[in-house]
Amino acid sequence: MSLVFQLAPQPSVPVLGQAEKFPVRRIYCVGRNYEEHAKEMGFTGREPPFFFLKPADALVVVNEGATGEMAYPSLTQNLHHEIELVVAIGTGGRNIKAADAEKHIYGYAVGLDM
């Protein structure tokens, strides 16, 4: 099968202390989960969190000690950012009991959400 355009490579992130990289297929996000930040954004802080996805190719890997660069529209007047706890899911599942959830976690990281 021929493609109309070339597929982008699978996004991945380095794993500290390992040669292998962790493939990123989906980025699940939780919004309005921090009350003080919700208030900064004009909400009361009592609204429930909401869930959404970001595409895996939105990922920008910045190696330790390096400075990252991210393109954004030149007329941007308020580029917002948040530090995030990243939870890398190692194994999938359904109807996972809370007591078993941690068994599905591959690892943790710090992320910068723009």
PLM regions and their residue ranges:
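Glycine-enriched loop-and-adjacent helix/strand subsegments that border the catalytic/binding cleft
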Residues: 16-29, 33-114
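Extreme N-terminal tail/first-helix region
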Residues: 1-16
